[in-house]
Amino acid sequence: MAVNDYEPGSMVITHVQGGGRDIIQYIPARSSYGTPPFVPPGPSPYVGTGMQEYRKLRSTLDKSHSELKKNLKNETLKEVDELKSEAGLPGKAVSANDIRDEKSIVDALMDAKAKSLKAIEDRPANLYTASDFPQKSESMYQSQLLASRKFYGEFLDRHMSELAKAYSADIYKAQIAILKQTSQELENKARSLEAEAQRAAAEVEADYKARKANVEKKVQSELDQAGNALPQLTNPTPEQWLERATQLVTQAIANKKKLQTANNALIAKAPNALEKQKATYNADLLVDEIASLQARLDKLNAETARRKEIARQAAIRAANTYAMPANGSVVATAAGRGLIQVAQGAASLAQAISDAIAVLGRVLASAPSVMAVGFASLTYSSRTAEQWQDQTPDSVRYALGMDAAKLGLPPSVNLNAVAKASGTVDLPMRLTNEARGNTTTLSVVSTDGVSVPKAVPVRMAAYNATTGLYEVTVPSTTAEAPPLILTWTPASPPGNQNPSSTTPVVPKPVPVYEGATLTPVKATPETYPGVITLPEDLIIGFPADSGIKPIYVMFRDPRDVPGAATGKGQPVSGNWLGAASQGEGAPIPSQIADKLRGKTFKNWRDFREQFWIAVANDPELSKQFNPGSLAVMRDGGAPYVRESEQAGGRIKIEIHHKVRIADGGGVYNMGNLVAVTPKRHIEIHKGGK
């Protein structure tokens, strides 16, 4: 083969991510060189040309190697970025975990480069036997040419191939060094971020613990700020203060729950562990703050309910209190309202009673019998009544008090002893009343022990230091009705109250009720045939140091007064008493109202008994009751309720007046009546009904 027939190989730079191939390759132009030409003895004729070709190819190879080395770091890190992108890692790591994921990519690439390097180094070596081969290659090549006297082509291709391997190994080693440094830098950065995260987490935890220890203080401070932002109340009542405080706490809870919802969203979308921990701690603190506020709200609600109950009880007490001055005069008073005005003045009423007693005494002296002498008429002012009220005297609960001695109370009777024994004292005269049309007539009636009982119960009044009043409590004869309270306002504190050492309570004067008027009438005796229905009356004794003489009190409660049933009730179907535990209660069935309407009952107890007897005898309604309840109902008792609807000892259905009797509601108006369970009855009254 002629020298001029030689074709040099080509340089190929291959960018491979650890595939085991050379980064720089030399590809010979031919794989066989044939039979070299005859070389005569003497110096080799190929040395000069061979060296020229070597230097030419070596220059190209060195330049390629130099270019790769110059941009090697950028290219290597670019490989890392490409691998991160393929793995779905963020372009810029912000957390220690992200950095460690990036480090794993770097370490994997470094391992791949090391495998490629090992693949090069494990190939059968011809000339490439030492790391300094690139420096020795030219001299080795020249020596081979001089020694062999062969054609240079084969030697040249072998040297170029080995140099390409050496340069590839150098590139891999440089990349491995770059990746190793990068890996270490990432490790250091990850550790730094982890240390910073631990420090930040410790700060967050310390802040959380401090805030948790001061939840109550923070909650109170926020409530104070919210309260200060509102218009200030001037001399607020406890009820106003409770209302304001309840509003503040309720709003604070609503605000905290909004924050709670937003914070829960942060937990779900937290960008890193630290932010998630912050949100988790905030969630716990919000739970504590809401619990603190709820505890406050519970206390406020409990106090509000307590005060409402006190006010309700006070209202019930006031509505059932007969207030009178203890000045020895004759007075009439309406329950919960005040003194009933006397048309011609209080003195005229006292004189009318005295005249009636005198007339009755004269009549009895000449012809002993049951006689009554009217002394006053009670009329009800319709202008003060609402449309739903019964505009008759029957709706007025009143009491009349007078000196018991005028009705014949013996001065020698030990009232205290009689009262302790729950005893009675016989009186020759008592007071009574009778409704006649729009007027109620008050009379003095003689007693005979048969038609008119002589015995009058005795009670002792007790001084209430809190109110400054003398009081007597009269239990109601109806289970669901509150007791009656009789009070007397003394002219001065009792003798054992020392004004010099204590400040006596000054009770308020008894107000005047303008809804009714007492008009004295001329004393006219009348004979009473049969049995007279008497209202409740008592003889009230007072402590010796009170200076108050015994008082006879006649009081009238509409429940204890005869009356006719009115109203139509309502049609009912299905489980009638199923509504007794809900809402207003179960209405009076219209078929029962039809049976009772127009009938006269001697008192409320009589009406109740007749009502339940009528229900028990109704062919449809009676099917809703068990044999035990039916047996009780046929005797005039109310049916039993299930245990969950009972209240203490109250275990039977009760009848409730929707419009209170004290407010003018009809006692026997069946449109004003509903059947309720004891539990529901209590709930209705707690609601102020």
Swiss-Prot record:
<dbReference type="GO" id="GO:0031640">
    <property type="term" value="P:killing of cells of another organism"/>
</dbReference>
<dbReference type="InterPro" id="IPR003615">
    <property type="entry name" value="HNH_nuc"/>
</dbReference>
<keyword id="KW-0255">Endonuclease</keyword>
<dbReference type="Pfam" id="PF21431">
    <property type="entry name" value="Col-Pyo_DNase"/>
</dbReference>
<feature type="binding site">
    <location>
        <position position="685"/>
    </location>
    <ligand>
        <name>Zn(2+)</name>
    </ligand>
</feature>
<dbReference type="InterPro" id="IPR037146">
    <property type="entry name" value="Colicin/pyocin_DNase_dom_sf"/>
</dbReference>
<dbReference type="GO" id="GO:0046872">
    <property type="term" value="F:metal ion binding"/>
</dbReference>
<dbReference type="GO" id="GO:0005102">
    <property type="term" value="F:signaling receptor binding"/>
</dbReference>
<feature type="binding site">
    <location>
        <position position="656"/>
    </location>
    <ligand>
        <name>Zn(2+)</name>
    </ligand>
</feature>
<dbReference type="InterPro" id="IPR044925">
    <property type="entry name" value="His-Me_finger_sf"/>
</dbReference>
<keyword id="KW-0862">Zinc</keyword>
<keyword id="KW-0078">Bacteriocin</keyword>
<keyword id="KW-0540">Nuclease</keyword>
<dbReference type="Pfam" id="PF06958">
    <property type="entry name" value="Pyocin_S"/>
</dbReference>
<keyword id="KW-0378">Hydrolase</keyword>
<comment type="subunit">
    <text>Purified pyocin S2 makes up a complex of the two (large and small) proteins. The large protein, but not the pyocin complex, shows in vitro DNase activity.</text>
</comment>
<dbReference type="GO" id="GO:0019835">
    <property type="term" value="P:cytolysis"/>
</dbReference>
<dbReference type="InterPro" id="IPR016128">
    <property type="entry name" value="Pyosin/cloacin_T_dom"/>
</dbReference>
<protein>
    <recommendedName>
        <fullName>Pyocin-S2</fullName>
        <ecNumber>3.1.-.-</ecNumber>
    </recommendedName>
</protein>
<comment type="function">
    <text>Causes breakdown of chromosomal DNA as well as complete inhibition of lipid synthesis in sensitive cells.</text>
</comment>
<dbReference type="GO" id="GO:0042742">
    <property type="term" value="P:defense response to bacterium"/>
</dbReference>
<keyword id="KW-0044">Antibiotic</keyword>
<dbReference type="GO" id="GO:0004519">
    <property type="term" value="F:endonuclease activity"/>
</dbReference>
<keyword id="KW-0929">Antimicrobial</keyword>
<dbReference type="InterPro" id="IPR003060">
    <property type="entry name" value="Pyocin_killer"/>
</dbReference>
<comment type="similarity">
    <text>Belongs to the colicin/pyosin nuclease family.</text>
</comment>
<feature type="binding site">
    <location>
        <position position="681"/>
    </location>
    <ligand>
        <name>Zn(2+)</name>
    </ligand>
</feature>
<dbReference type="InterPro" id="IPR036302">
    <property type="entry name" value="Pyosin/cloacin_T_dom_sf"/>
</dbReference>
<keyword id="KW-0479">Metal-binding</keyword>
